[in-house]
């Protein structure tokens, strides 16, 4: 029962037995488990890799996400600032793009020269060497729409969708190239099996289906195709409601979509089963963080029962998990799938 092999079968829309189970993200949780601060991690590939591998040796997630917890660091490499805190991931301060008319001035070569990003690249190679036989290793970043919002500021981007759509499109083109450039060193090194992206600002809680179709999906599709041409599948998570855009996500070429816990799993499977693998969707806060082991087992079993035997399904939390989720609860999530 190799978790990686089970996941790969599900990703190809097969029906592995047992059902694979995975976290989404999990970086901040793994680092908290290791007692490591981001100031320490950012300068030490060994420490990053050790935290990720040690956590996964305890829980057996089918997928690991190198760079989870660091998704704002590319913005810092491109000119924004980060505010380090005692606990949790650093907060993004300011924007790398002050004016949409100056998007072309964004120097993407800074992604290649950034020490923190190099730390993650080296860590991925160490993780792949240590657990790559049993865990599907990915690099992770924001997807183009959210990446653009982090570069320019989400409130300003929302206004510009109406006031300056051409300027937004120019920003999105640049953000799409930045996302590709961010992941490229991992692909060239062969240190990952796939690419993961998160796109919280493309949620139905933030933008309409029409705006998603106009501003988010085309750039998601473009970068997904570039990764696919190199043989790397894309895994995606969007926070919140995505019921009205699941078909568009599948149309973008996404191989595996990890649902938020607020999305109806049964309805999602009705829409896209057979088109892309679905992960979902145990509540990460009310069940995994605040619930008991029994609560986790019951919620996991409910998801497994809903998914049934139709294939292309992975048991996952409905988002990244908080740093304070008890280890026993994560173990219960994975164990319930692997023992089912």
Predicted feature locations:
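Glycine-rich, N-terminal phosphate-binding loop and its surrounding beta-alpha-beta segment
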Residues: 52-82
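Active-site loop segments of alpha/beta catalytic cores
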Residues: 1-30, 36-38, 51, 62-66, ...
